[in-house]
């Protein structure tokens, strides 16, 4: 069974060693989906959505929201951001009956990166 929760945050960045619009400072409203794979425990839940929300907000959203991403992720491409997010969540979101399965990060409504467990 898969359990997912979506989040939004705003941040600014620029892409280094890139020739185009994205080399200049600009911002995005990012959308993040975090998915766990697991088996419901005795309480019927893979993981309480409240716990999932708390972990993602604390480890990712509160760190990145309204930040200059290059201070946190030097080459802040969406691909590198997804990998950074995975590293922040991998340990806290792996329990006895569930594991971090997928991170999807949208930079725009039509452009996104998907990172899955098998790619780690």
Language-model-detected regions and their locations in the chain:
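Charge-rich, low-complexity N-terminal segments
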Residues: 1-120
């Amino acid at each position: 069974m898969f359990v997912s929760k979506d989040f939004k945050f705003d941040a600014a960045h620029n892409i280094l060693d890139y020739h185009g619009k994205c080399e200049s400072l600009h911002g995005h409203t990012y959308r993040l989906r975090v998915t766990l794979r697991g088996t419901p425990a005795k309480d019927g839940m893979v993981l309480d959505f409240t716990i999932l929300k708390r972990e993602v907000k604390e480890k990712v959203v509160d760190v990145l929201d309204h930040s200059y991403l290059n201070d946190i992720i030097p080459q802040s491409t969406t691909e590198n951001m997804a990998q950074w997010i995975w590293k922040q969540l991998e340990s806290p979101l792996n329990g006895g009956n569930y594991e971090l399965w997928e991170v999807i990060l949208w930079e725009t409504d039509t452009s996104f990166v998907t990172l899955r467990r098998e790619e780690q």
